[in-house]
Amino acid sequence: MTQEKKKFDAEVGKILNLMIHSLYSNKEIFMRELISNASDACDKLRYLSQSNSELISGDSNFKIIVKVDKDNEQIIIRDNGIGMNKEDLIENLGTIARSGTANFLKNLSGDSKKDNMLIGQFGVGFYSSFMVADKVTVTSRKAGENKVYTWESDGLGEYIVADSEQEFARGTEIVLYIKKAETTFLDHFRLKHIVKSYSDHIAVPIYFCDEASNNEIQLNSASALWTRPKSEITEEQYKEFYKSLSYSVDDPWVTLHNKNEGAIEFTNLLFIPSSKTFDLFHPDRKRRVKLYIKRVFISDENIDLIPSYLRFLRGVVDSEDLPLNISRESLQHNNVLEKIKNAITKRVLGELRKKKEELPEEYNKFWTNFGGALKEGLCEATTDHEKLLEVCIFRSALHNKMISIDEYIANFKEGQNTIYYLSGDNPDKLLSSPQIEGLLNKNIDVLLFTDTVDDFWVNVNSEYKGYAIKSATRSDIDVEHTTSRPQDKNTDSKKSDDEYKLLTDYFKEILGELVKEVKISKKLTLSPACLAVSDTAMDIRMERFLIEQKQIASASAKNLELNPKNKIIEKIFNDLKANNKNNEELVNLIFDQACILEGEPIADTGAFSKRLNDILQKAIL
């Protein structure tokens, strides 16, 4: 027999160290994890056997067997699923293969209490064995292959993979050598109770093999939970199914169990988590909804079963209209699958609308967790943007609470026909922005956008239900005529520009190419000045993001808007009328201040500091 001793990947070593020294109270989840893996192995082989029946020749009844050997203090879990060869054992048990597990590692803090809580939040599959076992052996033969391999480790940094000469049927057997402190798991009653509690929904039959009589007693109902009538399923059963499916300990916030009949027949059992999933924005994230066809597992990877923006969903979809022998490639652009996807999307958005109206506080928490992902759908061409915007909520600057756009519209001032927003990183900073002071002073609300995705979706959604969506940073906003006729606004605007031409020309002469234009502001009420952009220009925050991503080389010149009612601007204007043009430093300082408030870089920080010091000295002296 040849054998190889290998070191675990450093990442696996970290997980194993945590498992071995775990203080996590709910250690019984190891059984859920191992049975879930065994069930997946059976599902994979069932799928492959549709195109190659030889793989299950002589043993077509899938099952999982649990045994207890009290004398040797062992728990054995055996399945006749797809099995593993040498490469599979190394890949699956010696390295990090799941992005979720990689995220688990990123969130380790070094605080034992916090880190042990992460075990439940992530689920770490096979490695959870080491919470209760001081040694684990795995024996496996892959379907369609003859060689048998063993894997063995005490979890202390190394493992052994070896060829085996023993007679072994297809599948995998895991033997846990139970720690002295965890021998209560060897109790038959307790172990059977754990299996029934966590794994009753598993569609593969799970048997408990009595060590005395060698009789096999079935522990689970072995019927897919989603195929049962809702009236026969308890809330606890739904919760356990969700937890085993999502590798999570939180309860689902929403459970959607529906049977669709008619042109397209399918059943969905979907869950919206109550806690944020750690891989929601991970580049290698997967959509965690499994596709079944007539109760046969097909895939949960590379299928367009739900839109990307609903990737927080967990659950299963079981179709009656797809052929069992369909290839995964054919699923990519399948008409039936597209109709199922559309029906699920409509159902989920409908449920979210209902929750938003009936349970606003709970919905706010959901939005904090998953709103960023949902809004990605507003950037997709195939999305019904209006339906999606109906479930979006944003912070109201006027009322300092989360509201929908429909609520915003319901509170329009008489004659108002524009939805105003301001985007930035921090809602508190946005509230103090000069860009919105005039609107708020007139009791015109402004929606505060604080997610990066907001700057993208507003570029492809310029209106909602016939109302324009407009950034408060735009130059043509006139708070005095927000609700008046356009011709009145244009007349007054021209009058202001002519009246203050001496002032705007002076600022432009001093600032030169630093600004595109200097205008009299129709939205400022307190601040001396602010930066603004035209309706056709890129929004300030969007431009800054693209510069950070090196998509564009540098910032464009902005408009500078002046508030003629501000005492500082008024002084400069009066000086100009008296032919006094000695306010160059003050003009530069006003511009620098406007840049700072908008998060724009100052051209010369040294000169800015000197100007500020000079003005402070004059004020003191």
UniProtKB/Swiss-Prot annotation:
Keyword set, alphabetical order: ATP-binding, Chaperone, Cytoplasm, Nucleotide-binding, Stress response
GO CC aspect terms: cytoplasm
Residue ranges the record marks as coiled coil: none
Principal localisation: cytoplasm
Entry annotated with the keyword Chaperone: yes
Matching NCBIfam families: PRK05218.1
The family this protein is said to belong to: Belongs to the heat shock protein 90 family.
Protein's name according to its UniProt entry: Chaperone protein HtpG
Organism annotation: Rickettsia typhi (strain ATCC VR-144 / Wilmington)
